[in-house]
Amino acid sequence: MAPSSLKWTLLCALPWTLASPASYNVHHARDSDAQAFSPPYYPTPHGGWIADWAEAYEKASQLVRNMTLAEKVNLTTGTGMYMGPCAGQTGSVPRFGIPNLCMHDGPLGVRNTDHNTAFPPGITVGATFDKDLMRSRGVALGEEGRGKGVNVLLGPSVGPIGRKPRGGRNWEGFGADPSLQAIAGSLTIEGMQSTGLIACIKHFIANEQEMHRMSSVVTQGYSSNVDDRTLHELYLWPFAEGVRAGVGSLMAAYNDVNNSASSQNSKMLNDILKDELGFQGFVMSDWFGNYGGVSAALAGLDVSMPGDGAIPLLGDSYWGSELSRSILNGTVPVDRLNDMATRILASWYKMGQDQDYPLPNFSANTEDAEGPLYPGAVFSPKGVVNKFVNVQGDHNVTARAIARDAITLLKNNNNILPLHRNDSLKIFGTDAGTNPDGINSCSDKGCNKGVLTMGWGSGSSKLPYLVTPQEAIANISSHAEFHITDSFPSDVSAGPNDIAIVFINSDSGENYITVEGNPGDRTSAGLNAWHNGDDLVKAAAEKFRQVVVVYHTVGPVLMEEWIDLEPVKAVLVAHLPGQEAGWSLTDVLFGDYSPSGHLPYTIPRSESDYPDSVSLIQQPFGRIQDDYTEGLYIDYRHFAKAGITPRFPFGYGLSYTNFNFSRASISAQSSLDTAYPAPRSPKGSTPEYSTAIPPAAEAAWPKNFNRIWRYLYPYLDNPEGARANSSRKYPYPDGYSTVQKPGPRAGGGEGGNPALFDVAFSVQVQVTNTGARKGRAVAQLYVELPDSLGVDTPSRQLRQFEKTKILAPGESQVLTMEITRKDLSVWDVVAQDWKAPVNGEGVKMWIGESVADMRVLCTVGEGCSTL
């Protein structure tokens, strides 16, 4: 979501234009199967036709039938920025016991509060390739959010996916692959919602760069122009799995998609999300990402956050009272409002939040116990705002396990690692130490001082404590000398047996904060180490015979200046470790655990290895067009197609031991005797309501009502005057209709046609620890599709993975991976359906420890062989 900075709010929200998105002219060439702009799709499909949601929708619909116009509208509109304890909150319905729903960040912990856990972010979780940890972290996030009284925790993030290596918020997601994002995201959702908290999957969709994601005084926000097949096979894939997991809410992105704003893009929200994917929850805007009133409601937006209009902090809104007016004058059908309110309440009921769910016991606006209840109001009533509830439990154990099991060993010449406790160590780099100003001194982590634990922005969290690498190493070794500086000391001595450990990092974040010339994206730093980190490594390599590099990074980095230097014996990527930075690292450095992390992205030799189309768009004026001309070929898919050997491939990661893959087998589980899945079932019934425009009195101010200045209400001063005027007609978009559609052939359930998720093949492989130390291995399964499908496909696509338990030397474990029909399918842009090779003929499945290190080949119809 957006930041809480008042300065940012005023500067960035002023210039929004209110033009219809369909009015933008397309001035660039497009593929024949692409859309110049998102075509219309109306009306918004009703929710409630999925059997698993039937009980929740029945409860919600009974309530909505008895609610007034103002009560329904109140559910859909935030109360305004700084008008409550959370990042945002909806209006309440006291008559039915519906509280303000607290919507709060974030994806790695409860933001701007106390006694919380600062977990490792998504990119670190992805590097573990550990499904159990992915779900466990989700459970812990849910427990902490619920414990603080958060109704909707704004995560996980599966967009951006990492199309652009310099992208500022890539670290919030799980890696540069749709299946990795999908598996990690859906397991996170399952864990979070098992606690009764509502998860919010974001940012929908194609939000791959921070710079120009929103309009400025001189530049309109960019449009992500992506063709239909690429959208389905890359960017939609993780959202589909999140919907299949039953996610209760979704956040629309700031950017346009095919020249239509994400929050009022009827093709994306009505057609693809709510009809094709069968999404049953509610869609909210990102903060100040709702750019219109009627257009957004008709296009499928259900909640406007934080509620304010084009000029925040003045108490106006595109929705709120204006939505009440639009209902009374018939511009927005009552049917649409009923569905909006029902979707919100259905999610509330589905997660059991009607059963003694706690109210917010914190304030994101102050650390004081008492203060204004509505900080955005000049004359706010005051009261207790912080109860300092400790929600940490034993979640530090999970946080440490994730940070530890994500650590990725890239190089280990002469087996210099693990270290011995009596080794003579010289430690260099500020990244080993703490922020001298305090671990939480920079708002939303908007600085790069000390060890890098997370990126900056609304996806960050306050650290309850921080164990730095310096502290952890000093606790273990009495032979360590620390030089916490980014300039190599001229007077340092180097003994023949000394080992230099150099800590460097690369940072990024959200664009409302600029850090050292980087406005979110890594525009200034590029993929290089910050604070002259590359020079620090080279200086150490000139002085010492043995150098170990520890890299904390948000994503891909360049290492060519020093990776092949003879003294550089070992390289560890520790990603973003959160609060357990020190202990997780020493667990691996000193050999209590073998490293078992794998790269969730490719590390290139040069930025020129990437296609030009994934560079940051830095156009200074006008409307920015970001054309996804690379199609399906991002990250490792591109490197393979272009024949470029990266420095380290996707999925790469060494261990202190070795593993053998053997005794693989493949067995068919369900029929693939047709190219397309079995036809979908018709939609089930949905709640029915009166479509009559309600009495104007339902939008009138209650008598003797005590208004709070700037608080956004659904009431009208003159509701009778809002009635329809036959002389004025609203200019509805092309294709507008109020007739419900039967739904696309690719739909039929949450995530799409249920037949897509039939298990087509089960693959087993035995993994044996053949080394001398205990450790864990990751089996990665990549699919190669045959040419018979008639379309170009990437040579290998990750579709599944499993991680072993800790295996003792000589110990084995059999891993099972299931491959669905969808895993073997391509999106047919003509049929508008998923197409698989009949009987799986010609499909190859490769199993290995990275995309470039294959150990087993399984061919459908032929069996498996060890390579």
Curated annotation (Swiss-Prot):
Q: Which domain of life is it from?
A: Eukaryota
EC primary class: hydrolase
Keywords, A to Z, come to: Carbohydrate metabolism, Cellulose degradation, Glycoprotein, Glycosidase, Hydrolase, Polysaccharide degradation, Secreted, Signal
Q: Where is the protein found, in the record's own terms?
A: Secreted
Q: Which GO terms describe its biological process?
A: cellulose catabolic process
Q: Active site at which residues? A: 286
Q: Its Enzyme Commission number?
A: 3.2.1.21
**Which first-to-last residue range defines the signal peptide?**
1-19
Catalytic activity of the protein: Hydrolysis of terminal, non-reducing beta-D-glucosyl residues with release of beta-D-glucose
InterPro entries in UniProt: Cellulose_deg_GH3 (IPR050288), Fn3-like (IPR026891), Glyco_hydro_3_AS (IPR019800), Glyco_hydro_3_C (IPR002772), Glyco_hydro_3_C_sf (IPR036881), Glyco_hydro_3_N (IPR001764), Glyco_hydro_3_N_sf (IPR036962), Glycoside_hydrolase_SF (IPR017853)
A single Gene Ontology MF term assigned here is: beta-glucosidase activity
Q: Where is this region: Disordered?
A: 723-751
Biological role: Beta-glucosidases are one of a number of cellulolytic enzymes involved in the degradation of cellulosic biomass. Catalyzes the last step releasing glucose from the inhibitory cellobiose.
Instruction: Give the protein name, as stated in the record.
Output: Probable beta-glucosidase F
* Gene designation per UniProt: bglF
